């Protein structure tokens, strides 16, 4: 089968087309998964509005939209830990992007960890969920970085 | 600094605790990023409600909640392409999980591709966004798998 989009697909077909037509949700957001370009590990999950997506494409730095602060946000603007985007991908229904980044300072999480995913979900002897710290070393002290 | 949670943190502290306290959104969902345990590539982004999360933890197979169909969904129940979960992780604010899976049949996307992220976002000569197919080979024919 063809490795490219079928010739029968319209250029702006959501799944098979080659035109960017992001499907923003009711809040104007798409999901962004950010991975470390070297290790492949998931660093964080965040959201982009149309402006954040455009700025990321144009600048090559990761921009997000903070739901809690309700504002556009250039990753690293407070901490200096900028994310340089090496590759951007779009999913089948165009409501999620995956960016592979070079993480400035090595730490993406506001808690100082490399990744936001520093706890594994395990089960205890009774089968109940239990969290286990993994890769939970802090690479910076949040109190010193975010003043 | 310590690799485990600070002793000063309460066990049920959202960021530093070791108790699972998922923060579901207004629709009762958390985001799930699913990666291939071998390649590390992002296969898909989907959502879990409380029941999907519990069933995933208990069964070791990936369960999701389909927003479009508004129903609980065991990945592979139509296609047979089940996802075996090798590791689950939780993010800092407990509103996203990352699961590393062994993808049955090798393809996670309903279009037949290995990953839902089969298009790269590039820019054309004028700087406008342009999608380029990458890893876009179909491993199965959706018309034959979903009848």
From Swiss-Prot, chains A, B:
Any single GO BP term: L-histidine biosynthetic process
The EC designation for this entry is 3.5.4.19
Q: In which pathway does it act?
A: Amino-acid biosynthesis; L-histidine biosynthesis; L-histidine from 5-phospho-alpha-D-ribose 1-diphosphate: step 3/9
Please state what class of enzyme this protein is: hydrolase
**Record's Pfam families?**
PRA-CH
Q: How is the cofactor bound?
A: Binds 1 Mg(2+) ion per subunit. Binds 1 zinc ion per subunit.
State where Mg(2+) binds.
Answer: 91, 93, 95
> Gene3D superfamilies in the record, alphabetically?
4.10.80.70, Phosphoribosyl-AMP cyclohydrolase (3.10.20.810)
Query: Which family would the database say this protein is a member of?
Result: Belongs to the PRA-CH family.
Subunit structure and binding partners: Homodimer.
Q: What is this protein called?
A: Phosphoribosyl-AMP cyclohydrolase
Organism listed in the record: Rhodopseudomonas palustris (strain BisA53)
- The record's gene field reads hisI
